[in-house]
């Protein structure tokens, strides 16, 4: 879907993932942090620091009672285009499919997830928020097993969920473009992406 609006260019690529309770979600949590948790994350290093084609690149998994999405977000750095950042995201996805993360990289992510989780439980309000969050999703008792499940995620699990869910037939792409840039974007769009509908505001 391509949307014309008075705004800077922006892209969202969403892949469909299962509902809470599915065992793949722990590997997807790890994968989300691997891609965009901090300045050492893969998207930041590749797209913002090395290639300098984006001012923002982020990925997150949306977990709920119902099937949801794993979404990549990016905004190009002028004069680079949405097509360039989209291509760069697909390149990072292919890297994930072709090689598992290193032991060091995987352990770093697990340490970050554990630290963030424990930090959220350090106050009464934080603990209440986490219990409420897990109860709304399914069962508050998930709070007792979350870190153990994350610790069990292997590098092969991370590569496996990337191969399983990050496929062309499982994605939806939305692009926000300025009206005057719409023609240029269409001319440079990736050949293997399905035709988009355009909405003008």
Model region roles, listed by residue range:
Residues 30, 59, 160-162:
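Short beta-alpha junctions and helix-cap segments that line functional grooves
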Residues 8-19, 45-151, 171-177, 184-187:
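M16 family metallopeptidases and their MPP-like homologs
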Residues 39, 81, 154-157:
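Helical mechanochemical/support elements of P-loop NTPase systems and associated helical scaffolds
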Residues 1-42, 198-201:
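His/Glu-based metal-binding/catalytic segments typifying zinc-dependent metallopeptidases
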Residues 1-2, 145-201:
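Proteolytic maturation boundary segments
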């Amino acid at each position: 879907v391509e949307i014309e609006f008075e705004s800077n260019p922006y892209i969202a690529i969403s892949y469909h993932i299962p509902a809470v309770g599915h065992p793949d979600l722990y590997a997807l949590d790890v994968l989300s942090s691997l891609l965009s948790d901090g300045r050492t994350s893969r998207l930041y290093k590749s797209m913002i620091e090395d290639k300098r084609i984006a001012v923002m690149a982020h990925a997150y998994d949306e977990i709920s009672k119902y099937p949801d999405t794993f979404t990549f977000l990016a905004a190009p750095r002028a004069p680079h285009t949405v097509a360039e950042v989209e291509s760069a995201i697909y390149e990072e996805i292919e890297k994930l499919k072709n090689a598992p993360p290193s032991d060091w990289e995987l352990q770093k992510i697990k340490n970050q997830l554990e630290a963030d989780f424990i930090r959220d439980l350090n106050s009464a309000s934080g603990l209440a928020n986490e219990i409420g969050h897990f109860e709304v999703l399914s069962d508050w008792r998930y709070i007792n097993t979350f870190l153990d499940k994350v610790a069990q995620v292997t590098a092969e699990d991370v590569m496996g969920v990337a191969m399983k869910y990050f496929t062309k037939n499982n994605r939806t792409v939305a692009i926000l473009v300025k009206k005057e840039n719409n023609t240029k974007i269409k001319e440079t769009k990736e050949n293997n992406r399905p035709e988009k509908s355009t909405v003008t505001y």
